[in-house]
């Protein structure tokens, strides 16, 4: 899918190039769960998944951004793209060797921005342009590279972001959730890049929220641990 996205970009069909990357992100969110359900996980599959992620969320977005925005920056533009691709590679490598010994409450958070989200974030200037947003007042030579670099380093940071892996949905709200999903995808089909732009804005706003939430839960668990140790000392 990543190579297909690059092909679309070469043909200057940037709408399809972005849609291909978003489609790859959706598949990436489902393939692991499906593999676990059918008990089809393997080390080879894990490595192949990382390889395809590297192309879809590393090489393809970097190529699109260089082709559209950074080619005029010369060597600096190429360096920006190299930094981003390296950050994606480091993130995927870290994910592959990540230990499963972390406390269960940490499963609700990623360390840093995941590579699918990072790919969509770095494409934000193009997505905003396709949604009809007026980008004329923006100084591309400063704002876009700065945003690109920040996103790159968020990929390899330890900044906690929501993983949405273990969301508990009350049964009584299931019908409303299904309605919301249908409505979202219906609007996505009609106002594709406007809805994607809004989704990006919501995700960016959730980054500091997830950090504060993480710190709150971490402090709570630390206090509980101290309390348990005090109770144990009292017993002894």
Predicted regions and their residues:
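Alpha-helical transmembrane segments
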Residues: 55-101, 107, 113, 117-120, ...
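Membrane-embedded alpha-helical segments that form the functional core of polytopic membrane enzymes
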Residues: 1-47, 78-88
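C-terminal membrane-associated helical module and adjoining short loops/tails
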Residues: 107-236
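Juxtamembrane helix-capping/reentrant segments at transmembrane boundaries
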Residues: 35-54, 102-113
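Transmembrane helix-loop junctions in multipass membrane proteins, especially transporters and channels
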Residues: 10-11, 37-41, 69-72, 96-100, ...
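Juxtamembrane membrane-interface segments at transmembrane alpha-helix termini
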Residues: 30-37, 89-97, 157, 208-220
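Membrane-embedded alpha-helical transmembrane segments of multi-pass integral membrane proteins
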Residues: 1-4, 31, 59, 87-90, ...
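Helix-coil boundary and interhelical linker segments in multi-pass alpha-helical membrane proteins
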Residues: 4-19, 55, 59-81, 124-143, ...
């Amino acid at each position: 899918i990543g190579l297909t996205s690059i092909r679309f970009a070469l043909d200057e069909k940037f709408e399809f190039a972005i849609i291909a990357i978003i489609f790859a992100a959706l598949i990436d969110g489902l393939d692991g769960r499906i593999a676990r359900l059918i008990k089809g996980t393997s080390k080879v599959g894990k490595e192949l998944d990382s390889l395809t992620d590297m192309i879809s969320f590393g090489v393809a977005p970097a190529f699109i951004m260089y082709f559209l925005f950074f080619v005029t920056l010369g060597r600096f533009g190429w360096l920006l793209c190299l930094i981003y691709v390296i950050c994606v590679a480091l993130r995927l490598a870290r994910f592959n060797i990540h230990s499963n010994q972390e406390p269960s409450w940490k499963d609700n958070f990623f360390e840093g921005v995941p590579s699918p989200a990072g790919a969509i974030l770095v494409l934000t200037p193009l997505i905003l342009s396709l949604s009809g947003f007026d980008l004329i007042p923006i100084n591309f030579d400063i704002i876009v590279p700065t945003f690109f670099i920040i996103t790159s380093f968020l990929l390899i940071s330890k900044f906690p972001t929501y993983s949405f892996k273990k969301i508990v949905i009350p049964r009584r709200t299931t019908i409303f959730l299904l309605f919301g999903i249908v409505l979202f995808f219906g609007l996505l089909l009609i106002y594709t890049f406007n809805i994607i732009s809004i989704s990006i804005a919501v995700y960016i706003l959730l980054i500091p929220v997830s950090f504060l939430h993480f710190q709150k839960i971490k402090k709570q668990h630390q206090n509980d641990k101290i309390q348990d140790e005090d109770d144990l000392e009292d017993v002894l």
